[in-house]
């Protein structure tokens, strides 16, 4: 990429020992922001521990475009949300490369009385959105276009009712509709008509947060969600650390044979905490959890593993990196992630290209990857403007001298402090989010 310098990924022959504080969850932050905006008729909401990154700043900017007031209170991670839904004529929402903005806000815009245009990065135009837009149209919403850029012609209300949608490409289709469903006149029933919904824990997170905001949701029937009409309550939201962003750091403990501790790990979470721990245990790590932290102790040498990542697809790049630097000859199978071909980039093709480009053995399957660990050599690891790909390259680089990551700055999508936190971890310092404790 022109104008982008490569970042020399640090390597280490010695075990990594570090304690880290990870900034807030992107998934929780952006859901809390949307719910806080929808609750403004009831009052002002506050959010503590919010993630500040490109994705969350895009959400804040988009909500401001729609007329809401979102401001920092004391620190960047403490927010107040007020105002109301009142986009100006000609309003244009910039989605960037944020799937949550792209999929959560068209239903909100439909409740306004203005026409709102949505657009984003060039790469975002390949991200799936047509099923969500078709679902809104079936509810009577007027929409021009079936992909970016498109316009939502708000008429002040949405009738609601039952919508059938194929969400096999993204669980965010379901979450995006549910978040606004209580404000539809008749509420909303969503019926998923396709194959299994990927990243199901994120749908469960949406349901849980809606209930925390006083919204009645019935999810007792598989592939069917009913949101009763009613108010969204204004309240205070506390955001957990982003457990997905913790995985590269925990992986550093695995591949180096060291021990990495993440403070503030929640005892109970709507994030896929249990899945993360189970995956790390599959590679022979010892996982210890207390009321205040999670610690992973690695073995440096470990065998291959077989794992279904359908519900936690965002972890695939990091898990693929773990597989690539396992004991040479170890075979790992990553399954259930065909939907990753529609993420920030085609992550399966990208992982295969980058691992093979460093001398590894990675083959695509219909729904995942088969990786045979092999001695790797240095070279450029391309990020594809994908934060998870860049972080995966850093894991590979720990065990492979001479790896350079193209566009490490793309990690700003969810963790702007990543390069400094990675360096601090390897320097034996305590790596923390600059806002922690402020």
From Swiss-Prot:
It comes from the Bacteria. GO terms for cellular component: cytoplasm. The keyword Transferase applies. It catalyses: 3-phosphoshikimate + phosphoenolpyruvate = 5-O-(1-carboxyvinyl)-3-phosphoshikimate + phosphate. Phosphoenolpyruvate binds at residues 26, 99, 127, 172, 347, 388, 413. GO terms for biological process: amino acid biosynthetic process; aromatic amino acid family biosynthetic process; chorismate biosynthetic process. Gene3D superfamilies: Enolpyruvate transferase domain. It holds the Pfam family EPSP_synthase. Pathway: Metabolic intermediate biosynthesis; chorismate biosynthesis; chorismate from D-erythrose 4-phosphate and phosphoenolpyruvate: step 6/7. Keywords: Amino-acid biosynthesis, Aromatic amino acid biosynthesis, Cytoplasm, Transferase. The active site is at 314 (proton acceptor). GO terms for molecular function: 3-phosphoshikimate 1-carboxyvinyltransferase activity. InterPro entries: Enolpyruvate_Tfrase_dom (IPR001986), Enolpyruvate_Tfrase_sf (IPR036968), EPSP_synthase (IPR006264), EPSP_synthase_CS (IPR023193), RNA3'P_cycl/enolpyr_Trfase_a/b (IPR013792). Its EC number is 2.5.1.19. 3-phosphoshikimate binds at residues 26-27, 31, 170-172, 199, 314, 343. Disulfide bonds: none annotated. PROSITE patterns: EPSP_SYNTHASE_1, EPSP_SYNTHASE_2. It is found in: Cytoplasm. Catalyzes the transfer of the enolpyruvyl moiety of phosphoenolpyruvate (PEP) to the 5-hydroxyl of shikimate-3-phosphate (S3P) to produce enolpyruvyl shikimate-3-phosphate and inorganic phosphate. NCBIfam families: aroA. Belongs to the EPSP synthase family. Monomer. HAMAP family: EPSP_synth. This is 3-phosphoshikimate 1-carboxyvinyltransferase. It comes from Mycobacterium sp. (strain JLS). The lineage of its organism: Bacteria, Bacillati, Actinomycetota, Actinomycetes, Mycobacteriales.
């Amino acid at each position: 990429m022109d104008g982008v310098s490569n970042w020399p990924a640090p390597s280490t022959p010695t075990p990594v020992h570090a304690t880290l504080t990870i900034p807030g969850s992107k998934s929780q932050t952006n859901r809390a922001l949307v719910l806080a905006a929808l609750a403004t008729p009831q009052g002002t909401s506050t959010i503590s521990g919010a993630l500040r990154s490109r994705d969350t700043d895009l959400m804040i900017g988009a909500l401001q475009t729609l007329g809401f007031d979102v401001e920092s209170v004391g620190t960047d991670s403490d927010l107040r949300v007020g105002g109301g839904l009142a986009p100006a004529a000609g309003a244009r929402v910039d989605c960037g490369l944020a799937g949550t903005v792209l999929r959560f806000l068209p239903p909100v815009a439909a409740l306004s009385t203005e026409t709102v245009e949505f657009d984003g990065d060039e790469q975002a135009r390949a991200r799936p959105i047509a099923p969500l837009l078709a679902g809104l149209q079936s509810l009577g919403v007027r929409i021009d276009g079936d992909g970016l850029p498109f316009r939502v012609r708000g008429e002040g209300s949405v009738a609601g009712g039952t919508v059938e949608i194929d969400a096999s490409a993204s669980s965010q289709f379901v979450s995006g509709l549910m978040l606004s469903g209580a404000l539809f006149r008749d509420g909303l029933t969503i019926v998923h008509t396709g194959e299994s919904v990927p990243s199901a824990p994120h749908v469960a997170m949406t349901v849980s947060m809606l209930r925390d905001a006083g919204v009645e949701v019935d999810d007792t029937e598989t592939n069917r969600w009913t949101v009763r009409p009613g108010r969204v309550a204004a309240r205070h939201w506390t955001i957990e650390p982003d457990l997905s962003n913790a995985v590269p750091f925990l992986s550093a403990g695995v591949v180096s044979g060291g021990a990495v501790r993440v403070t503030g790990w929640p005892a109970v979470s709507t994030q896929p905490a249990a899945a993360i721990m189970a995956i790390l245990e599959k590679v022979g790590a010892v996982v210890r959890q207390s009321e205040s932290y999670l610690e992973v102790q690695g073995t440096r040498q470990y065998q291959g593993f077989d794992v279904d990542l359908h519900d936690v697809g965002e972890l695939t790049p990091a898990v693929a990196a773990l597989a690539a630097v396992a004991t040479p000859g170890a075979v790992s199978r990553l399954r259930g992630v065909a939907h990753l071909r529609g993420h920030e980039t085609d992550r399966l093709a990208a992982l295969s290209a980058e691992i093979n480009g460093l001398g590894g053995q990675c083959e695509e399957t219909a729904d995942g990857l088969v990786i045979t660990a092999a001695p790797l050599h240095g070279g450029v690891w391309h990020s594809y403007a994908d934060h998870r790909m860049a972080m995966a390259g850093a894991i590979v680089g720990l065990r492979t001298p001479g790896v350079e990551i193209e566009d490490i700055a793309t990690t700003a999508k969810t963790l702007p402090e990543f390069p400094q936190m990675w360096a601090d971890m390897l320097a034996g310092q305590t790596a923390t989010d600059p806002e922690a404790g402020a």
